[in-house]
Amino acid sequence: MNKRFVYNPRLLKNTIHVACVGDSITYGYTLLPRRKKCYPTKLQKMLGKRYLVGNFGVTGATLQTHGNKPYSKSRNFKYSTQFLPHIVILMLGTNDSKMINWRGVDAFRCDYLDLIAHYRSLPSCAQIYLMTPATSYLQDTVNPFPSTISESVIEEITKEVLQIATEQKLPCIDIHELTHAHPEYFLLDGIHPNANGALAIAKEVYLALRH
């Protein structure tokens, strides 16, 4: 992210700031060249010059504050706040599904509501969009490693995100539904989308923003 924009958002006062908050899927991990192929960059091209899209993804980030890499303790959390976004797109939860991080839906809900409240409190009056995690194509096993992403837990998280969106009257972009029948998007490692997958996510976000 260009820090000139982060620390001086008023230089672009006539643009609509879109903060893409998330983990490695938002960041564009495994994509080459990452900055050109990640979904926030594709979204920027679709939205055009009236918008400034910031990629604030953090590889390995969890939504839960007790996770092994809480998003709320990252530099990009601070940068996304200083960006003064008009729109915030939240896509977290994949890394929360790991055995070492998952404490159940109640803990997840509490931290999710806190994150929503944080962005709602910004002077830019951000409109918040929730996103469900992408489908994981890793095979769950009887005795998974503690650091293994779990699709069964991701399904729990997806239901909770949809429920929170309904209760908070927030739009929700269901990326889990978008990707559940597309294993070809995740051929490299079963978790991170390839360029086609990133493009599909960008298109889905674009349609939601233009709705």
Locate predicted features.
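Conserved SGNH/GDSL esterase-like catalytic core that processes O-acyl groups on lipids
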Residues: 11, 15-19, 25-113
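Short hydrophobic segments within beta-strands
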Residues: 21-22, 131
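Alpha-helical cap/lid subdomain in secreted, periplasmic
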Residues: 12, 71-211
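Short alpha-helical interface patches
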Residues: 8, 20, 27, 176-180
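A short, compositionally biased domain-edge/stem linker segment
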Residues: 1-10
